[in-house]
C-alpha cells in the first residue's frame, strides 16, 4: 500500500496548493485541512453521512454542466473554480493509476484491495471536495457554511429536541437552524445628500468583472 501511495504522489501532478493538499496531505498524514482557507473544516464536512454525497460521476457531470467554460478557461475566476479544477484533474490521475494497477496487478486479492481503498477512502474525500466547491459556487460560500453549521447543530441535538427532518441546502433560508437575520427596522434615507449623476462620477464606478 505504501508503494501505491508513492505512485499516486509521483503521477498526480499538482501545480496548485489546493491539489497538493489533496494528494499529499491526506496520503502522508500531514495535518493539512483543504477546507480551512474557505472557512470550513474536514471535521465539519464529516458530520454529513457518506451517502449524502452524490457519486463522483454525478458531481463531475454537474460541474461540467454548470461551470465547464470557467473550468476550461485559462483565466482565474475564483478560488473555488481553481480548487474544483484541480480536484477534477487529480481524480482523473487517480483513476488512471487505478486502471493501470487493475490491469497489471495479477493477484486478484491485491487488486480488489486497491480498488476498495480508492473507492472507500479517496473516493469519499473527492466527493466531499467536489460537493463543497460546487455548492459554494451554486449557493454561495456563506450559505454553504451556514448549512454545515446548521446540520452540525441538528445532528448533535437529541432527537426529542430537534426538528424531525435535517436542514436542506436548497431551502436553507427557510429551514436553517442557525442563520443571520437582517434588522427589521427600515432605514430612513437622508434628504441632505444627493448622488451626483455627472459623467465623471459614473466613469469612476467601473463594474466588477466576474466569470
Curated annotation (Swiss-Prot):
Family indicated by similarity: Belongs to the orthohepadnavirus precore antigen family.
Described purpose of this protein according to its UniProt entry: May regulate immune response to the intracellular capsid in acting as a T-cell tolerogen, by having an immunoregulatory effect which prevents destruction of infected cells by cytotoxic T-cells. This immune regulation may predispose to chronicity during perinatal infections and prevent severe liver injury during adult infections.
Keywords: Disulfide bond, Host nucleus, Host-virus interaction, Repeat, Secreted, Signal, Viral immunoevasion
Assigned GO CC terms: extracellular region; host cell; host cell cytoplasm; host cell nucleus; T=4 icosahedral viral capsid
Annotated region described as Disordered, given as residue ranges: 165-211
Chain's gene name: C
Name of the protein in question: External core antigen
Compartments, as annotated in UniProt: Secreted; Host nucleus
UniProt GO molecular function: DNA binding; RNA binding; structural molecule activity
Sequence ranges of the Sequence repeats: 183-189, 190-197, 198-205
PTM remark: Phosphorylated. Cleaved by host furin.
Amino acid at each position: 500500500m505504501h508503494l501505491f501511495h508513492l505512485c499516486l504522489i509521483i503521477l498526480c501532478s499538482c501545480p496548485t496548493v489546493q491539489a497538493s493538499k489533496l494528494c499529499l496531505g491526506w496520503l502522508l498524514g500531514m495535518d493539512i485541512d483543504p477546507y480551512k482557507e474557505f472557512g470550513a473544516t474536514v471535521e465539519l464536512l464529516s458530520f454529513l453521512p457518506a451517502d449524502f454525497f452524490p457519486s463522483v460521476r454525478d458531481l463531475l457531470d454537474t460541474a461540467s454542466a454548470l461551470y465547464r467554460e470557467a473550468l476550461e478557461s485559462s483565466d482565474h475566476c475564483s478560488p473555488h473554480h481553481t480548487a474544483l479544477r484541480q480536484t477534477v484533474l487529480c481524480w482523473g490521475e487517480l483513476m488512471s493509476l487505478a486502471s493501470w494497477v487493475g490491469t497489471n496487478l495479477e493477484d486478484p486479492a491485491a487488486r480488489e484491495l486497491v480498488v476498495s481503498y480508492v473507492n472507500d477512502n479517496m473516493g469519499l474525500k473527492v466527493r466531499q471536495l467536489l460537493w463543497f466547491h460546487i455548492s459554494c459556487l451554486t449557493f454561495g460560500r456563506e450559505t454553504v457554511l451556514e448549512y454545515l453549521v446548521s446540520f452540525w447543530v441538528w445532528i448533535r441535538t437529541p432527537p426529542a429536541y430537534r426538528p424531525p427532518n435535517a436542514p436542506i441546502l436548497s431551502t436553507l433560508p427557510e429551514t436553517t437552524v442557525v442563520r443571520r437575520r437582517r434588522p427589521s427596522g427600515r432605514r430612513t434615507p437622508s434628504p441632505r445628500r444627493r448622488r451626483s449623476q455627472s459623467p465623471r462620477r459614473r466613469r469612476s464606478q467601473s463594474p466588477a468583472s466576474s466569470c
